[in-house]
């Protein structure tokens, strides 16, 4: 070992110790971790819209939420979908309307700037369908021009190309709620207009939209009534224990609206439970009041547990034991929508959220398997999880997030599907995490694993990287793929060497790695961006798994050492999580800590072992 490398390792060890101390301090007494999950101001504005419709919006809530929304405005008056991102029309319109609803006057300087931005971005008519649905709820747009979602869709065979089960679970839940809403067309008018945002030129409506509107005007009445009731029952049946629908904001708020418009009173147990649960997603501090679009306690906890184990914390440490036991208790033991395509498969998955029994996810389950095996807790639960993972392999040999073979191209062509990704095809990053778990299980020679490896290798980009569906972006995908290949005995595969060469070529001058979320729409941004702690850690994890602990890795480690904050963490305002590529992004506030701990832990302990 060179003197320089020895110095770097010693500095990494000190940095790691501080980070571990910080991570342990953030653990909840029952053993779990939960970091803030930051998104964009549409979630906060829509909370105001929901509460206005339900008659529950009070001045304090409106004022505190408006404070947060104003703090996110860009200098040019617009709002973005992620920190440092470009202006986004629909986000800016929803923020503008939310601020008006909170009492901000149209002649206020910040709203004048927002209006200018909206005009430059295309005006009110160019907003997404989802935004126009919210405006229709407030009486600021007409439901008659919004694409309807016929509840009769519920009667399509489950395996039909456009059945609700051909949509990803997040879209499926939202669409069923919107079947009710677009049929009943709820409106609670606000006391202002937004005519100043309109240009007066609407885009032509596609043929399918016109057909759906034609049927909506003249439906088969008895069938429509039965279908509406079927949609209502489907929604009610899928409410989770915490009051949510899928643990995520879009189906949650639209389910509340749909059920209220259908006639359920606010004190109905379903609505009361849903509203009470929504309050637990509220954060308020000196920056204002904001809503989490989702909460990620299982994901945060399993990543934190793996990080501690990577850092050398012993499995009998109380923090490790508490975390593992908490995870075991989150096992999903019932069949959810995934059983539509796997009716004979026994349950065994784990959710992302506190409560999501209907939709356990494959990514979390793979990570939980690795964490439980290493912690020596929950062996039976891990066995069931492995069986469930093997059973959830898609026909293209990869793994998706929630479903099997949910990859039809038809749903995204529908006129109301412009609010983000609506299907759940297998992705390289989820496939990689499953393969890493199965490789650690000693199953590298299983036929299912070999097929999965072939799938992962086939998805490598020409430059040596992998696309990241659930994290930003090619750095994330590559950071997942290389450890998976190594875990399955392919560390010396040419694909791994190409990945190392690619990572070497995209390292920033400061030693870190960064990738702007614009890379999802513009290839020029691939692996380009300000260095972040989480993305640098992903690169280190890949390089270390590949056996490449030379100058590139050393510089990346030095970046983490040099940028650590006094509290043992790292500053990271940049979003490195992905909800819908190109449309919706996430800033997991624990990513900036758990991934550096894992990366530094593997480097430091690798040196010790060597």
Name what the model sees in each region:
Residues 1-610:
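Preference for long, amphipathic alpha-helical scaffolds in soluble/luminal domains
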């Amino acid at each position: 070992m060179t003197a320089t490398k020895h110095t770097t390792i010693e500095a990494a060890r000190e940095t790691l110790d501080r980070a571990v101390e910080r991570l342990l301090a953030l653990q909840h007494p029952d053993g779990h971790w939960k970091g803030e999950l930051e998104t964009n101001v549409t979630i906060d504005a829509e909370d105001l819209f929901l509460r206005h419709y339900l008659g529950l919006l009070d001045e304090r809530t409106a004022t505190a939420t408006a404070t947060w929304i104003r703090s996110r405005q860009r200098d040019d008056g617009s709002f973005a979908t992620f920190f440092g991102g470009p202006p986004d029309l629909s986000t800016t319109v929803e923020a503008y309307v939310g601020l008006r609803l909170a009492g901000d006057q149209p002649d206020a300087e910040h709203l004048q700037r927002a209006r200018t931005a909206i005009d430059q971005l295309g005006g009110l008519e160019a907003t997404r369908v989802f935004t126009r649905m919210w405006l229709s709820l407030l009486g600021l747009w007409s439901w008659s021009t919004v694409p309807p979602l016929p509840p009769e869709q519920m009667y399509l065979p489950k395996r039909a190309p456009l059945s609700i089960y051909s949509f990803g679970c997040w879209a499926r839940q939202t669409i069923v709620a919107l079947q009710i809403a677009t049929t009943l067309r709820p409106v609670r008018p606000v006391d202002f207009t937004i005519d100043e945002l309109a240009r007066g030129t609407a885009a032509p409506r596609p043929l399918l939209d016109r057909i759906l509107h034609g049927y909506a005007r003249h439906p088969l009445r008895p069938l429509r009534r039965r279908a509406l009731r079927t949609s209502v029952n489907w929604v009610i049946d899928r409410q989770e224990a915490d009051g949510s629908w899928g643990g995520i904001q879009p189906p949650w708020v639209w389910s509340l609206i749909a059920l209220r418009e259908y006639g359920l009173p606010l004190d109905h147990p379903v609505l009361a439970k849903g509203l009470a649960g929504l309050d637990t997603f509220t954060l308020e501090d000196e920056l204002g009041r904001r809503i989490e679009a989702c909460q990620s306690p299982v994901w945060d906890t399993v990543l934190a547990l793996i990080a501690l184990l990577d850092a050398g914390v012993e499995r009998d440490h109380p923090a490790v034991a508490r975390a593992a036991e908490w995870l075991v208790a989150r096992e999903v033991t019932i069949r959810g929508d995934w059983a539509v395509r796997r009716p004979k498969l026994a349950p065994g998955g784990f959710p992302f959220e506190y409560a999501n029994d209907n939709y356990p996810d494959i990514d979390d389950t793979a990570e939980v398997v690795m964490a439980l095996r290493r912690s020596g807790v929950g062996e039976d639960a891990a066995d069931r999880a492995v069986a469930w993972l093997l059973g959830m392999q898609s026909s293209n040999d990869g793994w998706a997030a929630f479903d099997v073979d949910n990859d039809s191209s038809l749903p995204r062509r529908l006129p109301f599907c412009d609010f983000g990704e609506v299907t759940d095809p297998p992705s390289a990053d989820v496939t990689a995490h499953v393969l890493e778990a199965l490789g650690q299980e000693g199953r590298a020679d299983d036929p299912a694993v070999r097929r999965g490896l072939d799938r992962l290798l086939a998805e490598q980009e020409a430059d040596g990287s992998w696309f990241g569906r659930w994290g930003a972006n090619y750095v994330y995908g590559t950071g997942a793929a290389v450890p998976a290949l190594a875990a399955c005995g392919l560390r010396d595969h040419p694909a791994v060497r190409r990945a190392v060469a690619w990572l070497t070529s995209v390292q920033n001058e400061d030693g870190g790695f960064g990738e702007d979320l614009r890379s999802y729409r513009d290839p020029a941004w691939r692996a380009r961006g300000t260095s972040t702690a989480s993305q640098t850690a992903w690169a280190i994890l890949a390089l270390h798994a590949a056996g490449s602990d030379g100058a590139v890795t050393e510089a990346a480690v030095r970046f983490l050492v040099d940028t650590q904050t006094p509290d043992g963490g790292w500053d990271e305002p940049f979003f490195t999580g992905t909800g819908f590529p190109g449309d919706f992004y996430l800033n997991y506030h624990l990513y900036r800590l758990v991934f550096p701990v894992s990366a530094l832990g593997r480097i430091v302990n690798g040196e010790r072992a060597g």
